[in-house]
Design a protein with these regions (language model features):
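Substrate-binding groove of N-acetylhexosamine-processing glycoside hydrolases
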Residues: 3, 12-18, 113, 137-142, ...
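Residues marking helix boundaries in flexible regions
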Residues: 48-51, 72, 78, 86, ...
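N-terminal signal-anchor transmembrane helix specifying type II single-pass membrane topology
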Residues: 2-47
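Short, low-complexity, Lys/Arg-enriched N-terminal segments of secretory-pathway carbohydrate enzymes
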Residues: 1-13, 44-61, 67-68, 74, ...
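Feature activates predominantly on carbohydrate-active enzymes
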Residues: 32-41, 121-154, 158-387, 395
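N-terminal secretory targeting and juxtamembrane "stalk" segments of secreted and cell-surface proteins
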Residues: 64, 70, 106-109, 144
Length: 721
């Protein structure tokens, strides 16, 4: 009997499984339909209610998706079963009911047709039928009803949103600004008084700074970058070559061994011309000349022998050297301006002159005042440029001018020779440029430039720039330019978005350019519009970001960009695709992994009672605990080695091998060494098999450093190594 029951269940396994699935799907559909009916609001009365309804219905959307997926899978199984039944039925009929069998009789007089037997037909009649009604699919009407309810709810919400938009048009300017600032707060975007759609005023010129010193990005990557910058509203580039320019003749040794070739730069500048960019080369002519003065052949021009930071302006050789540097760079760029086939614009040359820390210290310069030495040198360089290239305007950094009196600035006539570029990278511009200083500048210069930052300003060794801080810096500059621009007869020339690669020639790398792309595109799109647009359809940022999800806060109920807390982890940039996105997202993973390992090492070494420096000096610890403390170390080591190889692969198409190696050595290698030391320390402590009685010997170094009073007691000392 049991055997018969088992056979019966086995023959009807498909029917039973389909019947069970049907019962389950009916239950799921009924539950989901009730949930949907209860949670979908019929109308929305405000933006807040829309957001709340969207958040409440997120779970229902997920449930409906699962239900529709189950229905779809069941329909596929059912369709497959129907096709199989049809195929078996056709095969049976073709093999068992041959009414067309042809044979010759013995007389050869005709054809005999063999009829199907009654037994064969009864077998076909007894074959079980598919457990469906007709040829329709399971729950197709219910699935369509779910989709219809979803679309009805979306249409209702969009109609109410359109009604709210129409009502917003009747709001006052103050009310619209209040709504705008409220949405900025939800996004985590800094709210700056006076900046919004009603008062939008973009800077006339918007230049992006390319700092190439010591880390030359490949031209192929830079050409891709140009296309992105153009689409976001950039009008030009401030290019700082330093040792990456292909100098010639007496200056050949200034170029790094991995400097650009002239053909590469020509290709790049021609691409700049195609995009209609203006070019402003940045050539340091006073401070930050380490790349030249570090070399023995140019060391005699230093202001003081021990520091290559600043050049001595009192030596004639210094001026000859600077003139040749300027001549080679200016002539190289102007050849593209003079060619009729290009549209490269070059109207300004930046001569640096910031942070001149070594000034008036040599025997030749000490006889003059610092301010006078600075002004005289700047005027001499500017006069050389204006004498040879009258079409070029000279720009300098402003920080050395800030402490000077108004009288000194006016009597020097520096306003006739240069345009200052006022640089502040913090979130409080007026803390560095007071209203009084603005007034002084306005009485000396007819026009000025402003300089913000998108990277390289909040830490000399960061891996990823703090986007929110850089965005606030740029928005505050927009407010300052709107307020202070009227002081100058020609207003502000424009805003430069600086992106420093190193704090100076001897410093290690700041954030690499691909890791700073989110900061760059966010700040550039904002300054190009004059404010941060909260509407994703109107924000140019989304022109260059491709997402698998639709960044629309009205549909999801969540802001399409969120910069709260750790701004590095905005979903928009950690999930979407754009130029450099793979390395940016890798940097986030690397940052988190390094933080995890540092915390691990802190616990097993610094805060450990068994692997501390004391334990190591005295070789005194518990082997069992040491083994437990170091068991994760090999795993972490392997993870970092894997991340190093991944970094090399991701950066291969962006930088040369030297820059890649420097990044790995700077960010990953120190932690690898710390893990290796942890393993070595554990091995040393684990080799001990016998330990001394307490008290342990006192370290001799404590007496040598006079940290303890020496006593006459006979104490066995142990030397600290």
């Amino acid at each position: 009997m049991l055997k018969i029951i088992i056979i019966w269940f086995w023959r009807r396994k498909l029917s039973i499984s389909l019947f069970t699935s049907g019962i389950l799907l009916v239950g799921l559909w009924s539950w989901a339909y009730l949930e949907t009916s209860q949670k979908y609001p019929q109308s929305y009365k405000s933006i807040n209610s829309i957001s709340k309804a969207a958040e409440d219905s997120n779970q229902s959307y997920r449930n409906l998706f699962v239900l529709q997926k189950l229905i779809s899978d069941a329909n596929r199984v059912l369709s497959s079963h129907q096709n199989k039944v049809r195929s078996e039925k056709n095969n049976l009929l073709s093999s068992s009911t041959r009414t067309n069998v042809v044979s010759k009789d013995s007389a050869g007089s005709g054809i005999v047709v063999k009829e199907a037997s009654a037994q064969t037909l009864s077998l076909v009649a007894r074959r079980k039928k598919a457990p469906v009604v007709g040829e329709s699919l399971f729950f197709e009407e219910e699935r369509l009803r779910i989709l219809e309810n979803q679309q009805r709810a979306k249409n209702s919400a969009m109609e109410d949103i359109q009604m709210i938009d129409e009502e917003a048009r009747t709001l006052t300017s103050e009310e619209r600004q209040a709504q705008y600032e409220h949405e900025l707060q939800r996004m985590g975007v800094p709210v700056i008084a006076g900046i919004g759609p009603e008062t939008a005023k973009a800077p006339k010129e918007r230049l992006v700074h390319l700092d190439l010193k010591g880390a030359p990005a490949k031209i192929t990557f830079l050409k891709q970058l140009l296309l992105m910058l153009k689409s976001l509203g950039a009008t030009g580039l401030l290019i700082e070559y330093e040792d990456m320019f292909p100098f010639e003749g007496s200056l050949a040794n200034l170029s790094a061994t991995n400097a650009y070739k002239k053909e590469e730069l020509k290709d790049f500048l021609e691409t700049c011309a195609l995009h209609g960019f203006s070019i402003m080369p940045l050539v340091q002519t006073f401070g930050h000349l380490e790349y030249a003065l570090k070399l023995e052949e140019f060391s005699t021009m230093r202001e003081i022998p021990e520091s290559p930071q600043s050049i001595c302006p009192s030596q004639r050789r210094s001026m000859d050297f600077l003139e040749e540097v300027l001549r080679q760079i200016i002539v190289f760029h102007l050849q593209f301006v003079n060619e009729s086939t290009t549209t490269l614009k070059m109207t300004h040359i930046h001569i640096g002159c910031d942070e001149v820390y070594r000034i008036a210290q040599c025997s030749l310069c000490r006889v003059k005042l610092k301010d006078q030495i600075f002004l005289d040198h700047v005027m001499a360089v500017a006069h050389f440029i204006r004498r040879h290239w009258q079409q070029l305007n000279v720009v300098i950094w402003d920080d050395m001018l800030r402490p000077m009196s108004l009288t000194k600035l006016q009597t020097s006539l520096i306003g006739n020779y240069v345009e200052p570029m006022i640089w502040v990278y913090t979130t409080d511009i007026y803390a560095f440029i007071s209203p009084t200083l603005w007034e002084h500048y306005a009485q000396v210069f007819t026009t000025v430039w402003a300089a913000s930052a998108f990277k390289g300003a909040w830490g000399e060794s960061l891996m990823v720039p703090p986007l929110q801080r850089h965005l606030e810096n740029n928005i505050r500059w927009l407010a300052v330019m709107n307020k202070e621009g009227g002081r100058f007869s020609k207003g502000f020339q424009g805003l430069i978005l600086t992106g420093w690669q190193r704090y100076d020639h001897f410093a290690i790398l700041c954030e690499l350019l691909p890791a700073a792309i989110p900061s760059l595109i966010t700040t550039l799109s904002t300054v190009s519009k004059g404010y941060f647009s909260i509407n994703p359809k109107d924000n140019d940022l989304l022109k260059v970001v491709q997402c698998y999800f639709h960044p629309d806060s009205r549909r999801s109920g969540h802001p399409w960009i969120e910069l709260h807390g750790n701004s590095h982890h905005s979903q928009l940039f950690s999930s979407c695709s754009y130029l450099g996105s793979q390395f940016y997202q890798f940097s986030l993973r690397l940052y988190d992994k390094l933080a995890e390992i540092q915390l691990y090492l802190h616990h097993v070494q610094d805060r450990s009672a068994w692997m501390s420096a004391y334990n190591l000096r005295h070789n005194f610890s518990s082997i069992l605990v040491v083994e437990a403390k170091t068991e994760q170390t090999p795993l972490f080591l392997q993870e970092l080695i894997t991340l190093s190889k991944e970094a090399e692969q991701l950066l291969y198409h962006i930088y040369d091998g030297y820059t890649i190696a420097e990044f790995v050595e700077q960010h990953i290698y120190p932690t690898v060494v710390a893990l290796q030391n942890n393993l070595a320390n554990g091995a040393t402590l684990s080799r001990a098999r016998h330990w001394p009685r307490r008290p342990l010997p006192i370290a001799q170094a404590l007496y040598d450093l006079h940290m303890l009073a020496d006593t006459s007691n006979a104490i066995v000392h142990d030397t600290i190594h």
